[in-house]
């Protein structure tokens, strides 16, 4: 049977549990039509490059599928009907990767770096340096700056 990689984007206002339930539904569709899901990766909520159906973020999931084309067509038909699915893309591949995808490897690498530094991801704040400042540093006392005009008058 042909092998496919399928990426699914679900609305951000559905819970992770609801996304898993949706994937279980699509897994059932694949299995009813003679296929099987080899691997499921939940990439979590990520920002989108641009708004899709008024959403700035979405739940991302990767499905590795071994199924006949009719099963993929039925799954995609049901995804088009669902209001919770923003986008999806199915690509036929020669072989499925058994190792974690690049997104999962990146997440593991980032988590490992943060643990080595002794902080978590969400502690960073603006600028990524742990505070509000960027790369400018303190400019010190700038002294008396005198009167400034703001245009319009005189």
Swiss-Prot record:
Q: Where is this region: Disordered?
A: 97-154
Q: Do you know which SUPFAM superfamilies this protein is assigned to? A: Ribosomal protein S6 (SSF54995)
Q: Which GO terms describe its cellular component?
A: cytosolic small ribosomal subunit
Say if the entry is tagged with keyword ATP-binding: no
Could you tell me the Gene Ontology terms of the biological process aspect for this record?
A: translation
Q: List the Gene3D superfamilies hit by this protein, alphabetically.
A: 3.30.70.60
A Pfam family of the record is Ribosomal_S6
Instruction: Please note every region of biased composition (Basic and acidic residues).
Output: 105-124, 135-154
Q: Which domain of life is it from?
A: Bacteria
One of the record's GO molecular function terms: structural constituent of ribosome
Record keywords, A-Z: Ribonucleoprotein, Ribosomal protein, RNA-binding, rRNA-binding
Q: Which family does it belong to?
A: Belongs to the bacterial ribosomal protein bS6 family.
The job of this chain, per UniProt, is described as: Binds together with bS18 to 16S ribosomal RNA.
Q: What is this protein called?
A: Small ribosomal subunit protein bS6
Please report the organism this UniProt entry assigns to the protein: Methylobacterium radiotolerans (strain ATCC 27329 / DSM 1819 / JCM 2831 / NBRC 15690 / NCIMB 10815 / 0-1)
Gene this chain is encoded by: rpsF
